[in-house]
Amino acid sequence: LARDFSAVVLAARNAKALEEVAAVVKTTGTEPLPLALDLSQVEASQIVVNTTLERFGRIDALLNIAGAVPQIDLFEMTDETWKAGMELKLHGARRLTIRGWDALKQAKGSVVFISGSASLDPKPGFAAVAATNAAITALAKAFAEQGIKDGVQVNSIVPGAVMTGRRRSFLEKWAPAHNMSVEEATKKFPEEAGISRYGQPEEIAELLAFMVSPCAKWMTGTSVRMDGGEIKGI
């Protein structure tokens, strides 16, 4: 994205991580604007949009990738846990897209939502993840329908098992609880899922960049699965 745009606005809760990513963006010659905000808070999305327009005057692309929903058994999830997961990943993305819609219309811009493969193969231990991701895919479709009229392109990505810091942390907690080493746990999932390896964040980033590029302008209302072949259904 930093290769394709002259400026990139970054919004997340972790200020340190934001600054690290902003430093990398800057090395490409692109101007970064890091905003330490919690997008689960109602007012945060308007702050992002207002600050972006004040600084750069336009919004060409919006990538909704914030949010992690807890992987807790279906019968152990509380209402508060459900609400917290939905508030950031689903409603945070919904609010940000609505607040930025007028600017996206003016720029004939693009929006991408990140869902997840749990929505296509729900399990009891991933019920909240699956439900939230399914809602995101449906939300993206609804925005895409409006986008046809308004000139805004909207799609979603359904990634599978990507080796992120969050996944490593999960494996470090999951492994001892199941009497195995982290190495064994890390190896176990791809074998059980029928995939050759974990995905890398850079691979998802390349797909994101393509979906907001001129090459993909006729793509809208589409959900693209990138999971190494984990989901076998048609």
Task: For the regions a language model picked out, list residue spans one by one.
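Short, small/polar-rich loop/turn modules that mediate ligand/substrate recognition or access, typified
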Residues: 63, 148, 153, 219-221
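Short C-terminal tail/terminal secondary-structure segment
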Residues: 121, 209, 215, 220-234
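A conserved structural motif in NAD(P)-dependent oxidoreductases
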Residues: 180-181, 193-204
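Catalytic loop of short-chain dehydrogenase/reductase
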Residues: 110-136, 140-149, 161-162
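Substrate-binding pocket helix/loop in short-chain dehydrogenase/reductase
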Residues: 73-75, 81-86, 189
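Alpha-helical segment proximal to the catalytic Tyr-Lys
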Residues: 102, 145-146, 217
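Conserved glycine-rich Rossmann-like NAD(P)H-binding loop of the short-chain dehydrogenase/reductase
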Residues: 5-20
